[in-house]
Amino acid sequence: MEGRDPLEKRIKRHIIGRTREFFATTAPGLEGLCLDELKSLPLSIEETTAISGGVEFKGHLHECYLANLCLHTTNRILMRVDSFRASNFNRLEKVLSRLPWELFLFKEFIPKVDVTSRHSRLYHKTAIAERIRSSLKNRSDQTPFLSATEKIRSIPQHLFVRIADDRFTISIDSSGELLHKRGIKKLGARAPMRETLAAAALKIAGYDIREPLIDPMCGSGTFSLEAAMMSRNIPAGWYRNFAFMGWPCFRSTRWNHLRREAEKMFRHVDHPLIFASDKDPK
């Protein structure tokens, strides 16, 4: 494809080679716990700040990979695309027309767009989402994009647009399904606790892997499974995939290296001190 090599160089220079801004979202009240988790990982991240709803940080793309893989208490991790002011549609369309969507998405993708607006002149969510999708289509008609394989095209992409006091913040979701979905459960309970909240409760309670954990009304086993993964030092996202695997900047060699390094840290537990039961055999 014409323009493929120059585009790959731009992706490497602007997305892979530079630090990017990220936002790890959390349940209310867990921001500090998420911040502590981030700081405990082997990451060279900068400017980590806990704010309402999550933690902002700067880092390289592979650190986004590792945060998705390892964090127990975050819901999703967003990568910032751009931030700008716009108080009317003319200004919005002008700024959107300059966004380098080809660095973030393959040509075939029409992402889901989620919009929220607060204290802003532009508040019509559907109209704003339409402008976003239109700018992406126009850009793909005029500028070379990389084409995705059939496998990559099956990975949904999701943009988040937040508008506050006429300032737009556009982000792309690196996680895909919410991160509490660990990819290990076969059956769910009627009203299950999210794994992120169970992990937070265990951390706040000071769970010690050397001490017994007794879960006599375990339901779908959320607490016990989280404790088991912690006791063996298995990353929270070990058994699942992520949306960033469908990005043009994704490098499977780096991802596989990170997984191999994480696997070296697994703990072998001869007799796990976790006892779970429930009257419902399912």
Regions found by a protein language model. Give the residues of each.
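Short glycine/proline-rich turn/loop motifs
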Residues: 114-116, 179-182, 267-268
